[in-house]
């Protein structure tokens, strides 16, 4: 008879323990009910990137002196710089500049070490394409500035979301 009583007591303790665990989980669920949602509806709402965000690289052709510092500091030797030596003025003239963003790791070394500041990081992060060859940007594509998310009236930025007072 005693083993049956102890089994019944163990069953009762396990039931109370299970009810307590369920109650703790339910309390956590209720505590999150008053918070703002974390998920955003991406195509229609976009996050505003931080000031130091490493997006697509912007290139200013007129400032470049073809010193190739960007190629030397790049861990994967990515920027392709074509230049021609002008012998009468003893300076390099830049012919072509291109970066393949399919290979780029967005480390920012080229931007940091550029002596003339002809390279800068933009806030553009939508670089997806159907063909990987479209990710190879030449100096014309690198020279285009992206449209700012803040200026785009068709997209509601995350700062305009209503706040829930708790």
UniProtKB/Swiss-Prot annotation:
Q: Which GO terms describe its biological process?
A: photosynthesis, light reaction
- Asked if the Swiss-Prot or TrEMBL record annotates the protein with the keyword Magnesium, the reply is no
Which positions fall inside the 4Fe-4S ferredoxin-type domain?
Answer: 55-84, 95-124
Q: Where in or outside the cell? A: Plastid, Chloroplast thylakoid membrane
EC number(s) given by UniProt:
7.1.1.-
Q: Which SUPFAM superfamilies match?
A: 4Fe-4S ferredoxins
Cofactor section: [4Fe-4S] cluster
Q: Which domain of life is it from?
A: Eukaryota
Q: Which reaction does it catalyse?
A: a plastoquinone + NADH + (n+1) H(+)(in) = a plastoquinol + NAD(+) + n H(+)(out); a plastoquinone + NADPH + (n+1) H(+)(in) = a plastoquinol + NADP(+) + n H(+)(out)
Database matches in InterPro entries: 4Fe4S_Fe-S-bd, 4Fe4S_Fe_S_CS, NADH_quinone_OxRdtase_chainI, NDHI
A Pfam family hit: Fer4
Membrane topology per record: Peripheral membrane protein
Q: What does this protein do?
A: NDH shuttles electrons from NAD(P)H:plastoquinone, via FMN and iron-sulfur (Fe-S) centers, to quinones in the photosynthetic chain and possibly in a chloroplast respiratory chain. The immediate electron acceptor for the enzyme in this species is believed to be plastoquinone. Couples the redox reaction to proton translocation, and thus conserves the redox energy in a proton gradient.
Protein name per its UniProtKB record? NAD(P)H-quinone oxidoreductase subunit I, chloroplastic
The gene behind this protein is ndhI
């Amino acid at each position: 008879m005693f083993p049956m009583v102890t089994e019944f007591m163990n069953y009762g303790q396990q039931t109370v323990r299970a009810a307590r665990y369920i109650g703790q989980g339910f309390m956590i669920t209720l505590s999150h009910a008053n918070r703002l949602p974390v998920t955003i509806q991406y195509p229609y709402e976009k996050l505003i990137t931080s000031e130091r965000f490493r997006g697509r690289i912007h290139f200013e052709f007129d400032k470049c002196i073809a010193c190739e510092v960007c190629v030397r500091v790049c861990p994967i030797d990515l920027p392709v710089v074509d230049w021609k030596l002008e012998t009468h003025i003893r300076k390099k003239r830049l012919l072509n500049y291109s970066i393949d963003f399919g290979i780029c790791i967005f480390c920012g070394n080229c931007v940091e070490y550029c002596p003339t500041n002809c390279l800068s990081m933009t806030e553009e992060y939508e670089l997806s394409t159907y063909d990987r060859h479209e990710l190879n940007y030449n100096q014309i594509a690198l020279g285009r500035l992206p449209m700012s998310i803040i200026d785009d009236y068709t997209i509601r930025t995350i700062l305009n979301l209503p706040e829930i007072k708790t």
